[in-house]
């Protein structure tokens, strides 16, 4: 395995031509991400071989993550929906967040127990103003949805510690 120092010398572009790549995730030996301009979820390997894994119809896929059973989740922020890809490739609504906020939902992270955290910001600020207030919701494995944090300025990255006890939010 190369050291970080030697790996940095080997940095290279593995894919060009994206409209707007977002929500990078490593899954099953490939880098997956959303391409906002096309509505596609793309996976690319270290050699640059890419594959469109899913095209989300009529929505902008903001971010992705996987349930512990391997099913893909997609946050469609403008629509206020979390979609789930079934084994046959179909998309179904996993959670509807529209009743919680009229503002777009953004980032997603799933912990090892199947709890799903989704954050959303407030309305886009006017020039010179700040983002917020936003919120974080928890979608439990039983499907229930509840807000777990509010007054978040602009959460754009989350992680859960390996023991599933702490949600870390980049604000």
Where would I find each of the regions flagged by the language model?
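Sequence-structural signature of mature extracellular/luminal beta-sheet repeat domains
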Residues: 1-171
């Amino acid at each position: 395995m190369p050291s970080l120092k030697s790996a940095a010398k080997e940095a290279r572009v593995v894919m060009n031509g994206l409209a707007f790549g977002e929500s990078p995730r490593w899954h099953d030996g490939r880098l997956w991400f959303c391409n906002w301009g096309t509505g596609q979820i793309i996976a690319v390997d270290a050699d640059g071989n890419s594959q469109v894994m899913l095209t989300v119809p009529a929505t902008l896929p903001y971010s992705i993550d996987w349930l512990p059973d391997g099913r893909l989740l997609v946050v469609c922020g403008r629509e206020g929906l979390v979609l789930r890809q079934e084994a046959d490739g179909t998309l179904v609504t996993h959670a509807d967040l529209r009743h919680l906020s009229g503002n777009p939902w953004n980032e997603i992270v799933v912990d090892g127990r199947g709890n799903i955290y989704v954050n959303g910001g407030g309305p886009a600020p006017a020039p010179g103003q700040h983002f917020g207030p936003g919120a974080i919701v928890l979608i439990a494995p039983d499907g229930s949805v509840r807000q777990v944090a509010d007054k978040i300025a602009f959460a754009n990255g989350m992680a859960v510690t390996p023991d599933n006890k702490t949600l870390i939010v980049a604000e």
